[in-house]
Amino acid sequence: MSNGIVIIGSGFAARQLVKNIRKQDASIPLTLIAADSMDEYNKPDLSHVISQGQRADDLTRQTAGEFAEQFNLRLFPHTWVTDIDAEAHVVKSQNNQWQYDKLVLATGASAFVPPVPGRELMLTLNSQQEYRACETQLRDARRVLIIGGGLIGSELAMDFCRAGKMVTLIDNAASILASLMPPEVSSRLQHRLTEMGVHLLLKSQLQGLEKTDSGILATLDRQRCIEVDAVIAATGLRPETALARRAGLTINRGVCVDSYLQTSNADIYALGDCAEINGQVLPFLQPIQLSAMVLAKNLLGNNTPLKLPAMLVKIKTPELPLHLAGETQRQDLRWQINTERQGMVARGVDDADQLRAFVVSEDRMKEAFGLLKTLSM
């Protein structure tokens, strides 16, 4: 490979791929291009920065320069890729272009911001860069409104509450974590958030935001209003597919790839939050780690299909942490819930009494690995 591998992106997926490639090949040319600084940070830490009093710069684990030196890379930070000429094997920015033999899209996903009047007043916490832009406002805010009661929204609500702020969480579902599990399973965490002082406005919808002299006025449905100092959108992520679309690749929710992480173009691959693997978008660390291991082999000619095992998803709510696995969102499961002082074990079984999903909390999270072994896939 005279031109080597070009990777667009510098997040967790890109870094895992670089590390796995370098374990097998120390000299193949590797080029990374990204719009950010390319400094390394741990993205899940963003759910806890406020209670821990961390600034954006405190999150940096390794600078871009250190990364380049350690892994023998060419890095192009603060660079927006504008186009991909798949036929000519060329990646283009406004001022530069790079030839590639193999190209990897690791462009991640962007936070979805609800399209309501005043949406420009909403903050997002999907990157170190986004936190840097709003850290002063968030640190100074006394009253915080979080839009979305999913995984990130629940983590942020608890963190801001632990930092002593008045927190309101709004979601149009009837319970928190509604896309991940039924209400009878999420109720333990929901009750804990309420106990801590989080004001939950469920079955509610944001209509608009307006700047006032004393803060931000949020208008909700049923003619309700609330004034706050900061509004955070935690309403899910959308895979970044614009570049792939311009390159003529097949797109669905994400960039469509097969079990080899290969797109509809034989020399272009996708990895991480932007990828849709055989119809599934999996924006969690473990599938990204496993995908990066497989993709490194495939890029170097050792074709290996990705086989994902049953995997844990961790909800980092320190006052009541949860681990879950399996098809927790399935509507046809029968849930067997055992609750004790030290925690909860909820088992979701199908009509044949096969374990299809589980959720464990607190001290009973240690039972997760045993349950994983009995999970039917």
Swiss-Prot record:
EC number: 1.18.1.-
Cellular component aspect of the GO annotation: cytoplasm
GO-annotated molecular function: oxidoreductase activity, acting on iron-sulfur proteins as donors, NAD or NADP as acceptor
Cofactor field: FAD
Name this protein carries in UniProt: Nitric oxide reductase FlRd-NAD(+) reductase
Alphabetical list of NCBIfam families matching this protein: PRK04965.1
InterPro entries, per database record: FAD-bd_OxRdtase, FAD/NAD-bd_sf, FAD/NAD-binding_dom, NO_rdtase_NorW, Rbx-bd
HAMAP family for this protein: NorW
Record's keyword terms, sorted: Cytoplasm, FAD, Flavoprotein, NAD, Oxidoreductase
